[in-house]
Structures are given as C-alpha cells and as structure tokens.
Amino acid sequence: MRSLRLLPVLGAAALALAACSGGAPTPEATASSDDSQVPARPVVLNVYAAASLTETFGELETDFEAANPEVDVRFNFAGSQDLVTQLGEGADVDVLATANESTMKKAADAGQVDEQTIFVTNTLTLITTPGNPAGVTGLDSSLDGVKLVICAPEVPCGKLTKTLTDKLGVTLNPVSEEQAVTDVRGKVSSGQADAGIVYKTDALAEGDAVDTVEIQGADEAVNKYPIALVSASTKKDYGQKWIDLVLSTGGQAILEEAGFTPAAK
C-alpha cells in the first residue's frame, strides 16, 4: 500500500519538473542533435588496391586521415583483375593500384585511368604450414604429393608464378588456383593446404602462421606495382594526396618494411 500512495506524489513531482524546464532541450541534447546531422568525415575516397597491399595501405590510412580529417578512406582489396573489371562495370573508384603493369594497362587502354606511376616491386616465395611438416625445400621434387595452392594464371601473382616456373623449367601440380594471393596464404595458414606460392610481402604478413621457404631464382621474375588516379573521379585532389603519400619517404619506408622493394631501388 505504501508504494500506491507514493505514485501520485512522484507523478506530481515529475510534472512540476517538466513545467519548470519549459520543454527546452538541454545544451548537451542540442549539441548531440546538431552533431548527428553533420558527417564526421564528409569526403569519401575510394581506393581500389591489389590484395597484397592490404596491410600496408591500411597502415597508410591512419597517417592520411590524420592529415586530412575530413576524408574517410575506403578500400576494396581484391585480385587486380577483379578490380579492373569492377571499374569497367561502373564502380565508384578514385585511385587504382594493381599488382602488375599489364592489368593496369587494360584500364589505361579503356581510358579509365590517368598517368600511372610504379611505386614498388614484389617477388615470390613459398610458404608452408608451421614447422613445414611436408618437408618442402623449394620448387623441386619436394613438392611431389604436396597439397600446393597457387594464384590463378589470370591474376598478377599467378602470371608471375607462371613466368618464374617457365624460366626455371619447373612444372607445378597445384590442388587449387585462387583469385587473390590472400586466398592462397589463407589456405596455407588454416591448414587446408601444405604449401603455397605467394608474394614475399604476404609471407611476412602471415608471421608465425606460416613458414617461409625461399625460391632460388625468384629475383628473375618481378612484379611492378602501378598506381593511378581514376579518370572519372571527382576527388582527384584527395586522390593525388593519397598517391603522394604512397610515394613519400614515409610511405615508401612502410612498404619496404613490409617486404616490398621501393621502385627507386
């Protein structure tokens, strides 16, 4: 019964407080309402980049957005061939970075990109599951009977794999061919495959999740990575700032630390 007697009193008190406030919003509420109507980063910069650039471009994003607080950098990391296909299908892209020149050339020939710049190079290596239980020693007979995964021939890492094996006179018998180098390393690190051929940068990015086996003669096949503004972009000023960061001393240092070779070297 005590609680029943308190309810009218509490209700009256609440009405009194409401009357005193006059229904006016508090300063905090007003500020919150205004803030919700203004995007924190009103400019979106869409960067389409080869899958092998995932870690390094993600690191560069922090520096770029700190220097350009009005910009939200959004990435699409995938196989270079897929990126160019999406661009041709009308995707909203401001900057394109591919893992080889021939794929970028397709976009250039279609008039989809402006002048391109080579910013890094990359080479291949073998990775195995931790401890290398299959006993892989290189592109040799140690791969016989091993579950080997490589990139599909239509994507840059796959083209480079074919170029290298042709030069070395090696024939591979992979159990699968993937559309992105990150898929190759994912199958090895998860134990779905015994070994895979990936870029040196991808092997480093996996850390202790894989073991690395050097490929003798890997330097005979090198991929050059070009970057370019997309011709239809309406944010070329910010796109150029992104490219400038990639080419800067700091940007090149981050890429080199990840295993890439700066184009100037």
Predicted regions and their residues:
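Sec-dependent bacterial lipoprotein signal peptides
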Residues: 1-18
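Exported/periplasmic ABC-transporter solute-binding proteins
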Residues: 3-4, 20-53, 58-62, 81, ...
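Conserved beta-strand core positions
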Residues: 45, 71-73, 124
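Short helix-capping segments at alpha-helix termini
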Residues: 66-71, 169-171
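Short, high-confidence coil segments that cap the C-terminus of an alpha-helix
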Residues: 70, 92-93, 193
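Pocket-flanking alpha-helical
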Residues: 81-112, 135
